């Protein structure tokens, strides 16, 4: 794979991965537009407007210079008190992983908190995030594709050790590209 000027290839995975990573925001909290970092050129493109009336409940993006089992950079969701915009690079701490199956394929998400947000920066494990907020997140992902007749199932949550293990593997797999 040719490594071009995409955010995926040009931004490092973080200042101290896997404990402190960069997350490139693709979709801000509160959006229905599903943006994606372009893999083939610098920039961000609109993938689609989601079919439901739901909006993303948190910042959603990717950890650069990673390669996951789905052939894309590893997905990351960042809990923070304010929304940003596509292309913003956040300093984030992995605190867990949401295990998910999307249309029959594994599509796990790394759960992070923004290190520059005093509301969330002291959280070290996803279990410290209010249970209702986690349920809202789970509900969003299990519901937002229903009008497309696609099934998404959250199959569980894991702690920061598993998340960091997945990040390490994704960084190593990226280096093999």
From Swiss-Prot:
Its main location: cytoplasm. It is found in: Cytoplasm. Keywords: Cytoplasm, Hydrolase, Magnesium, Metal-binding. It is an enzyme of class 3 (hydrolase). The keyword Nucleotide-binding does not apply. Substrate binds at residues 34, 48, 60, 144. One of its GO terms (molecular function) is inorganic diphosphate phosphatase activity. GO terms for cellular component: cytoplasm. Mg(2+) 1 binds at residues 70, 75, 107. Mg(2+) 2 binds at residue 75. Its cofactor is Mg(2+). Belongs to the PPase family. This is Inorganic pyrophosphatase. It comes from Picrophilus torridus (strain ATCC 700027 / DSM 9790 / JCM 10055 / NBRC 100828 / KAW 2/3).
């Amino acid at each position: 794979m040719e490594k071009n000027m995409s955010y995926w290839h040009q931004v490092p995975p973080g200042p101290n991965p896997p404990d402190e990573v960069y997350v490139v925001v693709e979709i801000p909290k509160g959006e229905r537009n599903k943006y994606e970092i372009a893999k083939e050129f610098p920039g961000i493109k609109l993938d689609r407007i989601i079919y439901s009336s739901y909006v993303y409940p948190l910042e959603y993006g990717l950890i650069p210079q990673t390669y996951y089992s789905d052939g894309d950079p590893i997905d990351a969701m960042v809990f923070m008190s304010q929304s940003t915009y596509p292309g913003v690079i956040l300093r984030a701490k992995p605190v867990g992983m949401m295990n998910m199956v999307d249309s029959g394929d594994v599509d796990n998400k790394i759960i992070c908190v923004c290190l520059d947000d005093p509301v969330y920066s002291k959280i070290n494990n996803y279990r410290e995030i209010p249970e209702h907020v986690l349920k809202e997140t789970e509900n969003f992902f299990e519901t937002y594709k229903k009008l497309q007749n696609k099934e998404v199932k959250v199959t569980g949550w894991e702690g920061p050790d598993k998340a960091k293990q997945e990040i390490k593997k994704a960084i190593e797999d990226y280096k093999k590209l």
